[in-house]
Regions:
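Glycine-rich active-site loop/strand segments that organize a redox cofactor
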Residues: 76-124
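Short hydrophobic core segments
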Residues: 34-36, 160, 180-195, 208, ...
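A conserved short coil-to-beta-strand element within the FAD-binding core of flavoproteins
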Residues: 156-169
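N-terminal Rossmann-like FAD-binding beta1-loop-alpha1 element of flavoenzymes
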Residues: 32-58, 432-437
Length: 438
């Protein structure tokens, strides 16, 4: 049967284009790609490379793929944040602009469509955070695993030990049990946070073997330690809808300012806003940074003073220590009173205007001195990694070694909480896999 329309001869230019395409397709069919690490970035990279015709071997040292995905979002897996590209970039404080090509290739909207196209039901919650409808991270892992298998990828359990280089090109990976040769190698080993999931820094070792610079590692999205005794007395106290600022005491500048939830612990502070704040702290020298908490952000200073006056009037014959039942959580009363510096048994009707103003300022700027990060093993992600200037952002290929690619947490890019870090993994993995297949 003839096609509709007028038949014509192909032009010489069209014949050349078709010939080049056939050559590229034949080359892609025979191209071997080795992906090291079967986390979020590795699974996406492997499937992308396979979809573009490469023969893919995915190396994972754990018995099961996606171990770290399983614990993200408190076991629910915050798949991504369904925001626009510019919003995404603003939520990546470390080398966000490096990700423009990757995120435009696979946007958050594309990510949602990708998973739903594989049959995974998703839902969007507050702050555009996307989760599986089942609230089970295992469903995300199983969906990806089945997709990778259906794409024809070979998954092997082995531990990468050495990157094989020849004439300035990556030609394979020597593992504990076997050597795997390839035309392209993609390193997706993750960082050093949560080492029990297999993230033990193997990718940095392989990158160094290729001559890459590793930006010093530090924990990010991590709880903060404090030597303030108040924190220990308030451990377990969760504060919702509070303001949190991180102030650099050396420069006087506010490096972080947000609103949300936090938690006092025996070592200091944790919770969503605290984890995000940790991304903004660079030199964690003891005492350099203070956390300044606005306990009543919905009230202005004037409104809060009036509220205090009303409470004291209602409890005029009571001790001030018994007048905060409506204003503050029980665990916060004693620390506030101690800082306020007046006798606990002082009567409400004897509180002066100046004392009331001092209390107001204390509640609007409850300050906790930060002494350090919790260990990197407790961090959600690792800050630092392979220097971005040594990676081509349009392909994720090494600028130092041909045929070597990077994706995910091993790169010096990290973002805030809310699904942004997994999006980095999906987008860089997708771009690296596609590029490696060509």
């Amino acid at each position: 049967m003839k096609p509709y329309g007028t038949e014509r001869e192909f032009t010489q230019a069209e014949r050349r284009t078709r010939k080049k395409r056939r050559k590229r397709e034949r080359r892609m069919e025979s191209k071997k790609v080795v992906v090291v690490g079967a986390g979020a970035a590795g699974l996406m990279a492997a499937s992308a490379a396979a979809m573009y015709g490469a023969s893919v071997t995915l190396i994972e040292k754990n018995k099961r793929v996606g171990r770290k995905i399983m614990i993200t979002g408190k076991g629910r897996c915050n798949v991504c944040n369904n925001c626009d590209v510019e919003t995404f970039i603003r939520n990546v404080p470390t080398n966000g602009k490096f990700l423009y090509s990757a995120i435009n290739k696979l946007t958050p909207e594309d990510t949602v469509a990708f998973f739903e196209g594989l049959g995974l039901s998703l839902k969007t919650e507050r702050g555009n955070r996307v989760f599986p409808q089942s609230d089970k991270a295992v469903d995300v892992v199983d969906t990806l695993y089945n997709y990778v298998k259906n794409c024809g990828c070979k998954i092997v359990e082995d531990t990468a030990e050495e990157l094989l280089l020849e004439n300035g090109e990556a030609v394979g990976v020597k593992c504990k049990n076997k050597t795997y040769y390839a035309d392209s190698v993609i390193i997706c080993c993750g960082g050093k946070s949560y080492p029990l999931t297999g993230s033990t820094g193997d990718g940095y070792t392989l990158a160094k073997q290729a001559g890459h610079t590793i930006v010093p590692l530090k924990p990010s999205l991590v709880p903060l330690e404090s030597k303030n005794l108040d924190c220990k007395s308030m451990q377990g106290l969760a504060l919702k809808n509070v303001g949190l600022k991180i102030v650099d005491t050396q420069s006087g500048k506010t490096v972080y300012d947000d609103f949300g939830e936090m938690l006092f612990t025996h070592f200091g502070m944790s919770g969503p806003t605290v984890l995000s704040a940790s991304s903004h702290i660079r030199d964690i020298s003891d005492g350099r940074y203070n956390a300044v908490i606005d306990i009543k952000p919905a009230l202005s200073h004037e409104q809060l003073e009036k509220r205090l006056q009303r409470d004291f009037d209602e409890n005029h014959n009571k001790d001030v220590s018994n007048s905060f039942t409506k204003l503050l959580p029980k665990k916060l009363v004693v620390p506030v009173l101690k800082r306020w510096g007046i006798p606990f048994d002082k009567k409400c009707n004897s509180v002066t205007k100046e004392e009331r103003r001092t209390l107001c300022e204390l509640l609007k700027a409850f300050t906790v001195e930060i002494s350090g990060f919790r260990p990197i093993e407790e961090a959600i992600i690792t800050s630092g990694g392979v220097k971005t200037t040594e990676i081509n952002p349009k392909t994720m290929e090494s600028r130092l070694v041909k045929g070597l690619y990077f994706a995910g947490e091993v790169i010096d890019c990290d973002a805030y909480t809310g699904g942004f870090n997994l999006q980095i993994a999906w987008s860089t993995g997708n771009l690296a896999g596609e590029s490696a297949a060509y």
